[in-house]
């Protein structure tokens, strides 16, 4: 796999992680994929791949934003991915931001759970990401594209 381009895939646990795993499975033959998650339990589902853990945070508990940002920056410098791809949530915004600061492609795919509007993180990501996708056609406006859904 040494000659395959690298991708850094980031998601929190639950639906975000399941959707990211489906994307990674579709890309595994063409890319070397490393993973980042805010939940250490995700490590066991990606054995054989490099895995990095970042701390979870929310708007109500923002204490890990700065340390996580520097860890994301470190991961991107170390891994040298061609692109960062994420299905969210908030901690993964930092990977997208770090990727853009390092002149890497950053792809945000908003969760399929967001039927009526983009997630709060998705709204922020739409201003940072080089590519932004929704899984609902009605939410595709401007820079935000619809290309189908991951679970369908």
PLM feature spans:
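Extreme N-terminal starter segment of soluble prokaryotic enzymes
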Residues: 2-8
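Short amphipathic alpha-helix
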Residues: 9, 16-27, 40
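An amphipathic, basic-hydrophobic alpha-helix
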Residues: 60-82, 101
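Structural motif
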Residues: 6, 82-83
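An aromatic- and histidine-rich active-site surface loop
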Residues: 83-102
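Conserved nucleotide-sugar phosphate-binding/catalytic loop shared by glycosyltransferases and other
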Residues: 11-13, 31-68, 138, 147-151
